[in-house]
């Protein structure tokens, strides 16, 4: 049995370290409160694999994990070892044996798109973290398991600005806001299409990997049934093409075998009073209980979001945390 969870750390950085233009660095007191709070949430999750979003400093991530009191054999945030530049990175804490960790930054040439007024968009804004792990559970010792940690481009309008962060267009003009939102949509769509290729390369039984189990964790910045999420998962294609099952991803919430534990409505973020499930866990066919290729199942999915209704200090995450329990078969 393994627990998996995505965790938005909400700009986890060392004290005194500037991250976004116009936002003050954390002082020592605020940083300490952030470590204590995040460590406490990790302790509650007690997940075997945690995929982190918004990590500026690997040292801060390791400090937060240490505050949890839990033991992980690997804690890493590739690209943030000495501090991320320009945009936060993704991180991983795992108790499973790590075979390799890599970051996926660039799109294939055919996956690049032109974004109005910005030019060619050719790489993930936050490079994807890909890890190949080994579990001592499962049909055989050392069962391979891939994990993708993602953080797609947000729906926030992409306004034009200069290098100093000064606005270059009227943000009060509705037409300009619509065009800025289009830029964000194109960027997120391009990331989704590029990520789809990665998913297929891992899961296809006709591919180079021979089809290996995959768990995708992260902030999709849209709902599970949105166009961009389905570009990555292609779950809906299974309804009319059974041959698509091996390269589809399945929302853990939908394939959980203990549906009685579900709440009426799951959400991990509240924006302007509107709840959304942005933080998601997707699994390959190997974790769908009814599949003849199943090596396990999703037993249950839980959401930890009570803090979203508490005070809004920035040392808390503005996202809820989701945890899925994956049960691997033995023998």
Question: At which residue positions do the language-model features occur?
Answer:
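Short, solvent-exposed loop/turn elements at domain surfaces
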Residues: 4-9, 156-159, 290-291
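Flexible glycine/proline-enriched surface loops and loop-helix/loop-strand junctions
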Residues: 127, 176-180, 263-265
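Structured beta-strand-rich core segments of catalytic domains in phosphoester-bond hydrolases
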Residues: 49-51, 55-157
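Catalytic metal-binding/acid-base residues of hydrolase active sites
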Residues: 2, 55-56, 153, 220-223
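Metal-dependent phosphoester-hydrolase catalytic domains
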Residues: 58, 99-103, 117, 122-124, ...
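Soluble or luminal CAZymes and related metallo-dependent hydrolases
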Residues: 30-37, 123-125, 183-194
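N-terminal, active-site-proximal structural segment of metallo-dependent hydrolase catalytic domains
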Residues: 1-71, 76-90, 168-173, 193, ...
């Amino acid at each position: 049995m393994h627990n998996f969870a995505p965790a938005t750390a909400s700009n986890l950085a060392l004290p005194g370290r500037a991250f976004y233009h116009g936002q003050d660095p954390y002082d020592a007191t605020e940083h300490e409160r952030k470590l204590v709070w995040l460590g406490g949430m990790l302790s509650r999750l007690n997940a075997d694999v945690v995929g982190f979003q918004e990590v500026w400093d690997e040292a801060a991530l390791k400090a937060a994990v240490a505050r949890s009191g839990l033991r992980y054999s690997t804690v890493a945030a590739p690209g943030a070892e000495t501090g991320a530049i320009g945009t936060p990175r993704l991180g991983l804490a795992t108790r499973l044996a790590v075979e390799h960790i890599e970051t996926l930054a660039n799109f294939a040439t055919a996956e690049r798109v032109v974004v109005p007024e910005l030019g060619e968009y050719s790489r993930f804004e936050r490079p994807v973290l890909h890890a190949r792990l080994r579990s001592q559970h499962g049909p055989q010792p050392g069962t391979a398991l891939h994990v993708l940690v993602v953080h797609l481009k947000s729906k926030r309008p992409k306004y034009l600005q200069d290098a100093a962060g000064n606005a270059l267009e009227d943000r009060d003009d509705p037409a300009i806001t619509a065009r800025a939102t289009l830029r964000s949509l194109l960027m997120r769509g391009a990331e989704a299409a590029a990520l789809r290729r990665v998913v297929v390369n891992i899961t296809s039984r006709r591919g180079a990997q021979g089809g290996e189990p995959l768990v995708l964790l992260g902030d999709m910045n849209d709902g599970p049934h949105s166009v961009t999420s389905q570009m990555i998962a292609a779950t809906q294609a299974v309804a009319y093409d059974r041959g698509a099952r091996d390269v589809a991803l399945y929302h853990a919430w939908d394939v959980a075998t203990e549906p009685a534990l579900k709440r009426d409505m799951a959400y991990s973020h509240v924006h302007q009073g509107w709840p959304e499930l942005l933080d998601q866990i997707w699994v390959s066919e190997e974790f769908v209980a009814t599949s003849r290729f199943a090596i396990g199942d999703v037993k249950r999915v839980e959401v930890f979001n009570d803090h979203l209704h508490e005070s809004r200090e920035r040392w808390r995450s503005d996202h809820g945390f989701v945890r899925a329990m994956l049960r691997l078969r033995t023998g």
